[in-house]
Amino acid sequence: MASTPQIAVVDYDMGNLHSACKGLEAAGANPIVTADPATILAADGVLLPGVGAFDPAMDHLRDRQLIEPLHQAATSGKPFLGICLGLQLLFEASEEGQSAGLGILPGRVQRFRSEPGLVIPHMGWNQLQLQQPDCPLWQNLGADPWFYFVHTYYVVPSEPTLTAATVQHGSQPVTAAIARDRLWAVQFHPEKSAKAGLQLLANFVTQVAAAQLQTVA
């Protein structure tokens, strides 16, 4: 019988981790807040959260020698979830700064274009348009669920098949989530998205537990 899923929550001083940890705990996981590469690589799953600016985030990851461990974790088949800035960092670069991103996924991060009547940042609840309806993150959420967003930049994947959900902000379609194998990432904040957010975190924990069972078997 597999033990409680251990999920490394990467701590690089770019956001409050408490709410996400509570959501993981509620779903039956043991979140481990850590900046230790060995702990990240040994965990059953990894959560990369983050709020703030792209360049300082990459600097913090580099200072903690987390670039290579995150590459390994995200490409190993281990369940991996990025949230908000944690989504953007997975890509190659951002209009917000000069630093290269992690480059795990192809594409760039760009700023919303100004248009009449459009409020930037995109802040508040928005309804997803699911591009990968069978993505495990959407289980038990119903069609086109609502989530809470706060962001000025968004990812533009070079491979359209990466996109798992979009939203509309003004006239601009926005990538709200990506999925490839067991690598998932979302622009919205599950930890601020009430029942839907808790369900999404529970879905991630379910995937971590399933992968853990496969490893044990």
From Swiss-Prot:
Pathway: Amino-acid biosynthesis; L-histidine biosynthesis; L-histidine from 5-phospho-alpha-D-ribose 1-diphosphate: step 5/9. The active site is at 84 (nucleophile), 189, 191. The keyword Glycosyltransferase does not apply. It holds the Pfam family GATase. It comes from the Bacteria. Transmembrane segments: none annotated. Residues 6-214 form the Glutamine amidotransferase type-1 domain. Gene3D superfamilies: 3.40.50.880. It catalyses: 5-[(5-phospho-1-deoxy-D-ribulos-1-ylimino)methylamino]-1-(5-phospho-beta-D-ribosyl)imidazole-4-carboxamide + L-glutamine = D-erythro-1-(imidazol-4-yl)glycerol 3-phosphate + 5-amino-1-(5-phospho-beta-D-ribosyl)imidazole-4-carboxamide + L-glutamate + H(+); L-glutamine + H2O = L-glutamate + NH4(+). One of its GO terms (cellular component) is cytoplasm. It is found in: Cytoplasm. Keywords: Amino-acid biosynthesis, Cytoplasm, Glutamine amidotransferase, Histidine biosynthesis, Hydrolase, Lyase. IGPS catalyzes the conversion of PRFAR and glutamine to IGP, AICAR and glutamate. The HisH subunit catalyzes the hydrolysis of glutamine to glutamate and ammonia as part of the synthesis of IGP and AICAR. The resulting ammonia molecule is channeled to the active site of HisF. HAMAP family: HisH. PANTHER family: IMIDAZOLE GLYCEROL PHOSPHATE SYNTHASE SUBUNIT HISH. This is Imidazole glycerol phosphate synthase subunit HisH. It comes from Synechococcus elongatus (strain ATCC 33912 / PCC 7942 / FACHB-805). The gene is hisH.
